[in-house]
């Protein structure tokens, strides 16, 4: 559960309505793989991840980033039940994929950076604070199965 004020909920919702999930999802996942290269081990089937350009232009990275952001978008409509919303994904990433739950936090922080880059001055400190709460809540929900 994420505790947001009315102002924070409005800020998150207003900005998210302008997000191009295809573009932002691919960029966020791509940046995660470039900035934290050890995360690439979970994506060995994606082909060439040998350089930043290869990662950022990889169609499988872009497609999976879109999928990830689609799930995140779904979570935004269930902020009062993030653990329930992400229960299946938590189980998948824990039991089958064995993803280090710290990677969820890293991806959330990368997403905040990408949103700031895309929205510039519109991504005010108030908006950032609200999104930091949301990505922390999502990361916590995804890590729930690990506890």
From Swiss-Prot:
Q: Listed GO cellular component terms?
A: blood microparticle; haptoglobin-hemoglobin complex; hemoglobin complex
State the taxonomy lineage: Eukaryota, Metazoa, Chordata, Craniata, Vertebrata
Q: Which domain of life is it from?
A: Eukaryota
Q: What is this protein called?
A: Hemoglobin subunit beta
Please name the source species: Callithrix jacchus (White-tufted-ear marmoset)
* Biological role: Involved in oxygen transport from the lung to the various peripheral tissues.
Q: Name one GO molecular function term.
A: oxygen binding
Q: Which SUPFAM superfamilies match?
A: Globin-like
Q: Which InterPro entries match?
A: Globin, Globin-like_sf, Globin/Proto, Hemoglobin_b, Hemoglobin_oxygen_transport
What residues bear Phosphoserine in this entry? 45
According to the UniProt record, list the residues that bear N6-acetyllysine.
60, 83, 145
Q: Which UniProt keywords apply?
A: Acetylation, Heme, Iron, Metal-binding, Oxygen transport, Phosphoprotein, S-nitrosylation, Transport
